[in-house]
């Protein structure tokens, strides 16, 4: 019958469509069975010997063809962006045992398509086909790897995204990755060489964009958070004064510090000032006192991430009587998320090293044959790293000067209790950047609110200007109250609202971060 042929044809078309999409099913995912997730490898160099692993997550609440694309990088340097998927703003988190997943209702995929890149080569499942232990990279080589991978994404792997609006987004040391990659993309677009010209903006979360500002403001932040006494602070102001500084806010404390990699600075105990400021430097102090570097007010009574732990999750589970799930809750922790931050890395490490998970993700046989384990961060990369560009101002300047589109928008957001990349440094950095380019502050510092209940979520301000080509330029500086380094994890609801309102903001118009999602 004709109708049976029609039904067969429709079913065949559906099967072909599904097979062409190549959506993967994550083992242990029973909460979101219709998740549209793809994974694979992009070529990070011209000859294709460097393979960068990626996740591509399709938007849920907005049609894929209409939703913007966020291209995401974690920092480190040397840390995997899959931790952002499973621990920050992805749709699924890993349960304590490391074998199953549960839904994150505040995932950013509700409002955007998201590409997660494991950068640089050597991180996570990314690898070099010719070198089994590829760990030697720097700021410039990473920028080239990222640039080549993004081109390969648009040209070869997912050409259907070539007309999508897209934003580059990054966190922490991604405050270096993001501006450097953006400068390359803008330059390529200006030469009409880049496959997608719809580059709309840059998002930086708790960014490490200027070493001097980040290091010096850490002293200020610590001093005003009870890490010294009034008398000791007065002594610091006396002994650490530097030439030309009329106020402690402008002291160059780095003159009394030392470094081996140009990004991590320790107090120089051979100087009087160095001895005084050492307790204020937190994790980079030789007398580190054990507070959470990424969230000043967060505590874990058990450190699930100690380097010598063989299998801390297995050991903990063995101590929990059957069906007493409440025992998993950390009664001594200061968070309300079942202490997820305390054990998430270990759960994720266990999950992504399961054979069935790696098979589902399509991990290359060449990577598996090296008998390595997936790690949240590749510490040999970090240990060998020497920072090349300590100030991102020149790269922002390249972006602003060469941008040819109608408008380019920047969002700089920061958790206000992060001591790894503190909010003061980002605020000072943007203020100075705006001054260099003649931007005007069009919105003074003031609060924004989360949800229809108008709960204060932080503060924000805006700078606006234009370049010589007539492109409108804007920078929004947003703080998230009560959040540490990982804003989408610490304050998931406000983070989703903030990003959604930024993505849907209109050039030349004020973004309403208070608008509920």
Curated annotation (Swiss-Prot):
Name this polypeptide is given: Serine carboxypeptidase ctsa-3.2
InterPro entries reported in the protein's UniProt record: AB_hydrolase_fold, Peptidase_S10, Ser_caboxypep_his_AS, Ser_caboxypep_ser_AS
Organism (species): Caenorhabditis elegans
SUPFAM superfamilies on file: alpha/beta-Hydrolases
GO biological process: proteolysis
GO molecular function: serine-type carboxypeptidase activity
Family the UniProt entry places it in: Belongs to the peptidase S10 family.
PROSITE patterns in the cross-refs: CARBOXYPEPT_SER_HIS, CARBOXYPEPT_SER_SER
Signal peptide segment: 1-21
Active site: 172, 418, 485
Uppermost EC category: hydrolase
Glycosylated position list: 269
